[in-house]
Amino acid sequence: MTTQILMEKDTEVFVRLICEPHVKMELNHYFRFRPNGYQFMPMFRRKKWDGYVYLFNMDSNRIYAGLKSEISRFSVDREYELIDNTGEIFEPISNDDYFKFLTSFPCEYKLRDYQSLAVRHSIDNKRCVLLSPTASGKSLIIYYLIRYYLPEKALVIVPTLSLVSQMYSDFEAYAKIDDSFDAEQLVHKIYGGQEKETDKPIVISTWQSLYELNKDFFSDFSLVIGDEAHLYKARSLTKILKNLENTPYRIGTTGTLDGVEVHKLILEGLFGSIKKVTTTKELIKNKTISSIDINCLILKYNKKECAVVSKMNYQEEIDFIVSHPERNKYICNLVESLKGNTLVLFQLIEKHGNILHSILEEIVDSSRKIFFVYGGTDADSREKVRELVEKEKDAIICASYGVYSTGINIRNIHNIVFASPSKSRIRNLQSIGRGLRKSETKDSARLYDISDDLTHNDRKNYTLNHFSERIKIYSSEQFPYKIYVISLKG
């Protein structure tokens, strides 16, 4: 007799799998993974935990509903019969109905082919993760999805304060010639102490603002969109999406699946199967986004400094690098020499950002505008900086990685300078994305990746190893790069 698995609907978050005990064991082992760094976690070290996160609960028989396609694959591979009693019916939207929707409201920004395919895929499947790189126009995809489901309530979750303001501004721009969509009347922003409750059908919020809210807040939403979902803390994202137990339409977007905070299985479980929308290489080839040239500048230090740094831990090495006078002088002279709008990204505000900003204020001609943006800059001020820079031709923006690597949409950036060491794959790709957006004054961009060679007796320093990881990123994304070695004075 064929082994059967009966799948029943629990909520919009979970399905139940009714099956024999031995199949439960197989499901338990199939739907598990080890998170990054599990071997360093105290519970694992004390042998209280095997290092695995299990997605199928053998007691409740529950598993994330977004994993239905994986459950089907599991069953087919083992020749088990999967009986789907969830009652979900997937009927693809007809060509006529989709065309009627696309022409039902005016918008100056027309969907590109890959964007239209992403919108249609999301409508057809009701839940999915859209894999689409930085600068591919995800906010326009989100806008069209919200328009499709209006007047049903939609929750758009973003990773940073800046993106709340930016998403709102994008919606305003998309609806500029549409009298039926007034962002002020229809869209509510939640960040930094803003009122949570609203009668407006569209809510944009950071995940941090939603994390502590009780389940009642989420009960009326029909659509949830998790923008840049790979950037959320796994526990926070899971809690929020579990609270949305009445929400049938669930769309996630992500630029990358490599080295992400939230594991691929959890992303798919909470939203749905992954759909690859386009790639950076395709966008550059089609001239949708700017081409980018990467100049890797390796700064060489004297033997005495290398010997000193070789005895340092990671944080001490970082402190040494960002406080090095000749290094900071070199960076600022480089920035001063660049033509066009230049984005200088730093990690530490007090120890590095303030120093770079002060030097630039001294050496840069007073006719050039210099902006300083970090986590303490409120969202409205950041938005004003964005608007001002769009009109400038030779401005300098000193910004912390945290603020500008995750989505502030300045198209008019000609140069990006990585002034601080960064090992985060996501942060680096997002930062590069700042330079990929085309504008009227730009169809190419340059990245200056500054790294530090403090090798001593064949021992590479921490941040030089991080540079090697960034080179792997550039190679995998097929970005052209050149490496230059510069000897620092001192």
Regions found by a protein language model. Name each.
Residues 139-144, 148-173, 348-350:
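Conserved Walker A/P-loop ATP-binding site and its immediately adjacent core
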